């Protein structure tokens, strides 16, 4: 089960939406799989804090020692406004050493960003070796918004 050990590929595959999934049917206030308060949740996952801190510290040190071959981590949160992306990032990243992390929010593209391909503004924030980076939103939204917006302009 997720949150009860190592996260496996099978866990990720279980998170996929089925063929008949409709976003209209989702209750945005629901917390499926968890019945409890915020403090219950914090208590349930508190034992991971030290492990996460140590793993991030080793990752960062490895990045400093073996810059080119060291791994990095990119966390991408995509969701509607007020869906809790920023809160999730703040909560998870609160256990990390800030010098090995970076959080990037993507809003409306600037004029300079619009002059380049849609991944240009994303690539400049890719994690360097040993770094953990969180993206608050992603390039998927850029592609969707720009295409839908441009198609509406041309109607």
Language model features: what each stretch is:
Residues 99-109:
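Short beta-strand-centered segment that lines the nucleotide-binding/catalytic pocket of NTP-utilizing
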Residues 85, 112-115, 141-147:
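Switch/connector loops and helix/strand junctions flanking conserved nucleotide-binding motifs
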Residues 2-51:
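Charged, amphipathic alpha-helical linker segments immediately N-terminal to NTP-binding catalytic cores
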Residues 94-98, 112, 124-128:
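Conserved catalytic network of the ASCE P-loop NTPase/AAA+ motor domain
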Residues 63-71:
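Phosphate-binding P-loop
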Residues 130-132:
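Loop/turn-to-beta-strand initiation segments
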Residues 153-155:
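Conserved small/polar residues in nucleotide/adenosyl-binding loops
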Residues 77-92:
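Glycine-rich phosphate-binding P-loop
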């Amino acid at each position: 089960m997720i949150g009860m050990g190592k996260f496996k590929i099978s866990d990720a595959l279980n998170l996929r939406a089925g063929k008949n999934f409709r976003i209209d049917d989702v209750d945005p206030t629901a917390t499926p799989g968890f019945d409890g308060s915020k403090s219950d949740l914090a208590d349930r996952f508190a034992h991971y804090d030290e492990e996460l801190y140590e793993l991030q510290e080793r990752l960062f040190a490895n990045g400093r020692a073996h810059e080119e071959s060291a791994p990095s981590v990119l966390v991408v949160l995509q969701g509607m406004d007020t869906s809790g992306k920023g809160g999730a990032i703040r909560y998870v990243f609160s256990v990390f050493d800030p010098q090995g992390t970076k959080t990037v929010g993507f809003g409306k593209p600037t004029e300079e960003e619009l002059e380049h391909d849609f991944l240009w503004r994303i690539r400049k924030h890719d994690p360097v070796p040993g770094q953990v980076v969180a993206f608050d939103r992603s390039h998927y939204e850029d592609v969707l918004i720009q295409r839908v917006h441009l198609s509406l302009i041309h109607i």
